[in-house]
Structures are given as structure tokens and as C-alpha cells.
Amino acid sequence: METLTSSSQSLISSPMSKKDYSSEIICAFDIGAKNPARTVLEVKDNSVRVLDISKLDWSSDWERRIAKDLSQYEYTTVLLERQPRRSPYVKFIYFIKGFLYHTSATKVICVSPVMSGNSYRDRKKRSVEAFFDWMDIFGLRDSVPDRRKLDDVADSFNLAMRYVLDKWNTNYTHYNRCKSRNYIKKM
């Protein structure tokens, strides 16, 4: 598991009162067996702090590994990339929802992928480019390992950042939404 160090960045210019927004720990998972990824962000006051960005491995003994990955932080919100109905990874979504159901007040939300349109390869390329842009903003670019397969990490990070920006009603040009605003769906 590779992890980036934490850093914080203020993303909005208009102040928000504590009544409007308190500290929140957001976790986003890009689901998969061999290449799942997790991003954990802390949103407090007017800033976002990257707590963790990790590549995970759920290829064997996945129940224990997912439980361990879920137990590392006290999440307020867990975002899961929506999977097609017959995907073999749907079991991960149901396991995570079940694991968190009675143990915490964590909201578990299934969301559509951030990048849409064009080809699969183009979407992954745009996701990695947006991820690198954010790493520059957070001052973490040097912490990103040099590797070819960064799209899973990028996807999990972009899921989390889109959620934060949408809560703050802030636009970011890299995140092209579908025509409908129904990309968040509770399962």
C-alpha cells in the first residue's frame, strides 16, 4: 500500500460559518479486486486536507482486507464508485455498506465516475491529468510515485474532490458532469 502525505489547501473564497459546515472525513473508493484505491480527505472550516491516498489489494481474503481498510479512520461519508449490476465488484459495495451499517453514522453513497464521455482510455487519461493538477495545488506532486497505472488512485481522488466541490457549490472544469445531476444515487 502506497500512501501520500497529508497537506491542506483552501478551496473557496467565501467564508462559511461553523453552522453551515463542520469537520468531515470523506473517503472515496475506486472499486476493484487487484487495483482498488482509497482517498481520505478531511474537510474543516474552509480547507481540505489530504489524509491518505492509497492503492489497495483486495485480490485475496478480501473481507478481512476491506474491514481493515474501513477501520483505519472514522469516516463521515464513504463514496463508492457505482458498478454495473452484474459486475463481480458489486459484492464489495454490499460488504462495505453492511460493515458500516450498525457500526457508525457514516453515510455510504454510490456515485458515478467523475469523467464521462469519449473512450475509456480518454476518460482515464483525463482523470490522471486532473489528479496531477490537484497534486500540484496541494503541493504533493513529488509524493506521487512514478508509475504507469495511476488511474485507480486518480479516480478515487477525483470522486472525493468532486463531492467536496459539489457541497461547496464550486465548479472545476476538469469534472464534466453528465447532463443530469443524478450522478449520486443511494443503493
Curated annotation (Swiss-Prot):
Its cofactor is Mg(2+). InterPro entries: HJ-resolvase_A22 (IPR006932), RNaseH-like_sf (IPR012337). GO terms for biological process: DNA recombination; DNA repair. One of its GO terms (molecular function) is magnesium ion binding. Binds 1 Mg(2+) ion per subunit. The keyword Nucleotidyltransferase does not apply. This is Resolvase OPG149. It comes from Variola virus (isolate Human/India/Ind3/1967). The gene is OPG149.
